[in-house]
């Protein structure tokens, strides 16, 4: 297994797919990395020479913000929104959707499990 940006990448996958295991690199960014380094994207990661691996590491290190740095930046951006008291920051704090989605019926992923109502419990008959 090759290790790039602190992530073990699977040798049996194509380079384009293996690079997406790194946080911050998706399909389009993986293709861009392959084009910029001149390494064919259909080549499997296990078939790469040590020179090609070093070339990949250098390119990713110098040009793309990945893993810990990217996660830290996202967290700091959210913290900044909360600190300055924006509406988006408030939504993050309350655990509700941030981008304007409706919450009357949906947003279960963000809000968590549904809470039962007291009105639906059967009343005791005399």
From Swiss-Prot:
Located at the top of the head of the 30S subunit, it contacts several helices of the 16S rRNA. In the 70S ribosome it contacts the 23S rRNA (bridge B1a) and protein L5 of the 50S subunit (bridge B1b), connecting the 2 subunits; these bridges are implicated in subunit movement. Contacts the tRNAs in the A and P-sites. NCBIfam families: uS13_bact (TIGR03631). The lineage of its organism: Bacteria, Pseudomonadati, Aquificota, Aquificia, Aquificales. The gene is rpsM. Belongs to the universal ribosomal protein uS13 family. PROSITE patterns: RIBOSOMAL_S13_1 (PS00646), RIBOSOMAL_S13_2 (PS50159). One of its GO terms (biological process) is translation. Residues 107-126 have a biased composition (Basic residues). This is Small ribosomal subunit protein uS13. Pfam families: Ribosomal_S13.
């Amino acid at each position: 297994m090759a290790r790039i940006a602190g992530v073990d990448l699977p040798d049996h996958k194509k380079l384009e797919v293996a690079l997406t295991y790194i946080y911050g690199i998706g399909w389009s960014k993986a293709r861009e990395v392959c084009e910029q380094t001149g390494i064919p994207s259909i080549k499997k990661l296990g078939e790469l020479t040590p020179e090609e691996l070093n070339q990949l590491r250098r390119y990713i290190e110098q040009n793309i913000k990945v893993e810990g740095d990217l996660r830290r930046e996202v967290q700091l951006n959210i913290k900044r929104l909360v600190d300055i008291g924006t509406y988006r920051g408030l939504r993050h704090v309350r655990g509700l959707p941030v981008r304007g989605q409706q919450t009357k019926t949906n947003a279960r992923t963000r809000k968590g499990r549904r809470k039962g109502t007291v009105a639906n419990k059967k009343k005791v008959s005399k």
